[in-house]
């Protein structure tokens, strides 16, 4: 079930302060955050946000198509290495 429209988008206060500071100063340095649950808002467009995936910070460049999505959607937490090859099929 999606979030109610009357509540508005959720964004952590500390991240919002960092974004506003970067926008007013024109700083292009990546903003480090652990807040994967924060929603992308229009003021973030053009900024690079380094989102933590549990091991490292993944740089995410925010575009206008990303508005309304959560930051965690763009920093995958699991790595898929593929299934093991079938040894019987390899010999034939």
From Swiss-Prot:
This is Small ribosomal subunit protein uS19. It comes from the Bacteria. The gene is rpsS. GO terms for molecular function: rRNA binding; structural constituent of ribosome. Coiled coil: none annotated. Keywords: Ribonucleoprotein, Ribosomal protein, RNA-binding, rRNA-binding. Belongs to the universal ribosomal protein uS19 family. It comes from Vibrio cholerae serotype O1 (strain ATCC 39315 / El Tor Inaba N16961). The keyword rRNA-binding applies. GO terms for cellular component: cytoplasm; small ribosomal subunit. One of its GO terms (biological process) is translation. The keyword Cell inner membrane does not apply. Protein S19 forms a complex with S13 that binds strongly to the 16S ribosomal RNA. InterPro entries: Ribosomal_uS19, Ribosomal_uS19_bac-type, Ribosomal_uS19_CS, Ribosomal_uS19_SF.
């Amino acid at each position: 079930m999606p979030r109610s429209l009357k509540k508005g988008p959720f964004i952590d206060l500390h991240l919002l302060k960092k974004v506003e500071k970067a926008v007013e100063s024109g700083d292009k340095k990546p903003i480090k955050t652990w807040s994967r649950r924060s929603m992308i808002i229009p003021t973030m467009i053009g900024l690079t946000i380094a989102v933590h995936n549990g091991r490292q910070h993944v740089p995410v460049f925010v575009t206008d198509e990303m508005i309304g999505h959560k930051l965690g959607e763009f920093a995958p937490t699991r790595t898929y290495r593929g299934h093991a090859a079938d040894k019987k099929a390899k010999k034939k």
